[in-house]
Amino acid sequence: MAKDLLFEIGAEEIPAGFMPNILGQLKQLAETKLNDAHLPFESIETYGTPRRLALIVKGLADASAEISERHKGPSASIAYDADGNATKAAIGFARGKGLDVADLVVEDGYIYAETKTAGVPSKDIVSEMLPQLITGLNFPKSMHWGDLDAKFVRPVRWLVALLDEEVIPVEFATVQSGNVTRGHRFLGADEITIKNAASYVDTLKENFVMVDQDARRELISKQLHDMAASKNASIVWDDDLLEEINYLVEWPTALCGGFEESYLALPDAAIITPMKDHQRYFPLVGQDGKLLPMFLTVRNGSDHSIEVVQAGNERVLRARLDDAKFFFNEDRKKPLIDRQDGLTKIVFQEGLGNLADKTERLLKLGRVFGEECGLHEDAAVVLERATELAKTDLTTGMVTEFTELQGVMGKEYALLDGESPEVAEAIFEQYLPRFAGDVLPQTEAGKVLSIIDKVDNIVATFSRGLIPTGSQDPYALRRQTIGILNILLGSEWNISLRPIFKASMELLNVASDKQEELLNQVEEFFTLRLKNIFLDREVPHHVIDLLLSNNELSVADAEGLVNALLANRIDENVELVQAYTRMYNLVKDVEYTGVNSDLLKEDAEKALFEAACKASGASLAAWEAGDYAAVVAVPATLVPTINQFFEDVMVMDKDEAIKANRLQLVRLAYSVMSIIGDISALK
């Protein structure tokens, strides 16, 4: 008879940002453990609130499945003597499998042992598994408490472990499991008996705990939208904020608060940021899209004394907005252009000067990038001015207090200073994209400023030997690299980043004898990120390996070639790979110096020379035209001629001059085919 398992870990308040990952881990870990134990089940559900992690496994079998295995032993000629008696080899093999010699079977000239392992009761499997679920979870930060060696994301206060109605003994950090949980910290009972897994969700709901995070999220969203509609307003919606609030409450109740209209004189960002990022409030806008002097938030509790909670939230926000108003008024006393001197007081990175130094590097790097990509003159003028002002908002009180507003306030202040909208937008766009899925810069100047700022950050950090390893990436270099690549993938710039990296190293005064190693490290870092981008698009590994074997490719070329390679189905062309590999084996150590056409004697070698020259011209023309389908098609056109050449011509001729010339010919054909990369990667 199938059973249901309930396992709840009760703890001090768990950080909201940790919860989705923890619940995902818990489910995956339980699935793995049960599958490894061959214990069938119907479904696994995980639940989470600030104070608890819960797992419910439905339809758990009474015992694990019986396991039948067939083990191959030595050959029958070794296992038995001429009279058919078992030898030591057979006896030892049988003993090792827990069988008698008589249980062995002979098949295809070998002996086999067939064993069966009885199923293990589910209670025994679960008893061993549950402590492993606790210790198997990984957290961004763990903690110890008391004088215990145990560690967890937060101190564990209670455990519930039930297989149907039977308590499964589990101990962790001196806490013993039972069938008693706790309700809402202020509204529910301190001790609540859980009968079984089926009653868990409803029993907690009776004690002001909505343990199902999906139902809780849906309720919060409905409450917020209903309340906004009642105010004839719309919410400045944020899914991430909803997710955070969802894991901050066990019994959600939405409320609406307000603030004085005078604060609306501040830039919208100066109001929205304190609301969302600091207080976890949802701003409201009217039918005209303009901010209203109201906000929505969610209380972890009932509507009892809701007006007191509302007043408290209003008071806290008012203090935040007073700060913002003060900083804004102080900041406006000095335009951005007059704040450049302040950049000398802000350190960029240890040993790499200050932000004034960085600004000078960006001005020069922007000119290099502009030349490489053929930036329009108007955009170049915008880029120059935006770069001069790019970091000046970091000296303002507003950005010092609300660091999330870097670039945002730069744009606001630039507009108030009378700078052009294009300059202001580029100042904002330098930080895009700020996170996965964020918008990319849309203006030409903004794209360039974003790229060169990130390149300077990456090369500077690498030059200090601070290369990200494992999960450690304190300077967010992976995110910045992916940002650069996504900007380039979405642009029309067909440029290589290598000249930009080299210029950056020069501007950072990297020693000449260190530059090649640093360049290789940075390019490898970018290549891996680009590979991951293509893997996320489900591009096959071998196609990516072919593509990225060509270090000279621009990101735009890589994008075009990926699409062309997939459309061409080049990875299915076995003859192409074979011909390419054969040439590689012949000329991998041969340096190309040129083919002497006067030494070509055989028709097949003359034909190959003509075909290779023609293919080379076609490839170059296709590259220049951006016709990636034509570029990808070129290597296959050489295959019949190459095969005929190898069939009719002896490359390693006795005449050294002819031999050397034929190797040069093969090298030429190989080079033409390699224009898209190392085709042998398609093996």
Put a short name on every predicted segment.
Residues 1-683:
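Amphipathic alpha-helical "coupling" segments that flank catalytic cores
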